[in-house]
């Protein structure tokens, strides 16, 4: 299958090239001269042909998992994690495997800062990237000076050329400023000594101590969920009605700025025909903000129990947890705890899927997050319709 290259992307934007442009055998047609004469080939077409070896490499990397359009960003993460960049050949191979236009894959990959795209003829970046936060909190603690120092040491040959240092926006680790990230490992209180030690030894940042599933259950965690799971249909409806009244009486409001009543929002979503979905926004990107990182890294089951409670009250069938790519330790611990929660049987029929962002600040906005979960660029949606009516995959979304 022939894929569009960079020239096609600039020329067509989001449009796919008609299938009739190329013959069925995948051979590009000769170019037409000014007099209508056919021109011979000038060489291999740039970025258009799928390289079988690259396609096979991506197929092996992805394994036997069923390919889903909404998982495109995760597949891009897998390639970035494996090779340290996204080459045009690998993107073409991925597009071919997913039966998507190359333009569509490229525009998604190029939208997110954590993907390093390498076009034909471009030199691949160093194999290892260390991002040093230069946002406000870290800047005040010497982040910019540290970045300059590490870059100077690399220029002087004191650090291997396979390592590069780049500035980064807020990593959500303001409590340990200045912070740095060596791939998926956070380095708190970063300085030349501990960064050199990380470069030399590759010592990862350990998962923090937190209240795990067993300890949370021992403190009466999920007791209400157990009662809801065990209730008859009539008893369940009565319990949900009482819980919804309690939520409304509590006068809780959203913290996104509009202050919309939480109880009313949940009731609105519950009023639409299903299936109903939920998206948990863990993509805080405001400089100086790390509240989500704090509670998720210390007491994750408090959030997860809230998800299960909402699933009963609103009738949610599937929930997506969208977590910042800058929080790898949280992604690791949530993966572990979700497996324990599923094994316990408390989830019932609810599905929970963990998604990671890719460094796009705008995805903290709810509709941009929805677009990203669907595997697209994180562009905010026009409203109405509101997400409560038509959100994720056009379903009512809490």
Language-model features: locations:
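Feature of Fe-S/electron-transfer and energy-metabolism proteins
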Residues: 2-398
């Amino acid at each position: 299958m022939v894929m569009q290259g960079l020239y096609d992307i600039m020329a067509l934007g989001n449009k796919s090239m008609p299938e009739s442009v190329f013959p069925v055998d995948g051979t590009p047609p000769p170019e037409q001269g000014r007099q209508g004469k056919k021109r011979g080939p000038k060489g291999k077409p740039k970025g258009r042909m799928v390289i079988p070896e690259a396609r096979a490499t991506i197929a092996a990397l992805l394994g036997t998992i069923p390919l889903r359009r909404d998982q495109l960003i995760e597949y891009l993460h897998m390639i970035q994690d494996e090779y340290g960049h996204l080459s045009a050949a690998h993107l073409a191979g991925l597009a071919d495997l997913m039966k998507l236009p190359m333009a569509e894959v490229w525009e998604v990959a190029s939208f997110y800062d954590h993907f390093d795209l390498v076009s034909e003829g471009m030199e691949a970046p160093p194999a290892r990237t260390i991002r040093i936060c230069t946002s406000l909190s870290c800047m005040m603690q010497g982040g910019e000076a540290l970045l300059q120092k590490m870059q100077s040491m690399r220029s002087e040959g004191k650090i291997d050329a396979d390592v590069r240092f780049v500035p980064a926006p807020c990593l959500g680790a303001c409590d340990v400023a200045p912070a740095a990230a060596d791939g998926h490992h956070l380095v708190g209180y970063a300085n030349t000594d501990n960064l050199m030690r990380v470069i030399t030894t590759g010592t990862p940042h350990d998962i923090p101590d937190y209240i795990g599933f067993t300890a949370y259950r021992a403190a009466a965690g999920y007791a209400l969920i157990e009662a809801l799971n065990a209730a008859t249909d009539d008893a369940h409806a009565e319990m949900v009605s009482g819980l919804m009244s309690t939520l409304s009486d509590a006068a809780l409001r959203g913290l996104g700025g509009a202050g919309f009543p939480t109880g009313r929002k949940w009731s609105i979503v519950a009023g639409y025909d299903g299936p109903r979905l939920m998206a948990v926004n863990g993509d805080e990107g405001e400089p100086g903000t790390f509240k989500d990182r704090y509670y998720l890294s210390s007491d994750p089951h408090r959030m997860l129990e809230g998800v299960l409670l909402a699933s009963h009250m609103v009738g949610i069938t599937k929930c997506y947890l969208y977590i910042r790519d800058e929080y790898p330790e949280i992604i690791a611990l949530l993966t572990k705890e979700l497996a324990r929660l599923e094994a316990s049987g408390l989830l019932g029929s609810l599905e929970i899927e963990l998604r990671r962002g890719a460094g796009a600040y705008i995805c903290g906005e709810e509709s941009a997050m929805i677009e990203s979960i669907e595997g697209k660029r994180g562009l905010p949606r026009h409203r109405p319709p509101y997400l409560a009516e038509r959100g994720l995959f056009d379903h009512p979304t809490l």
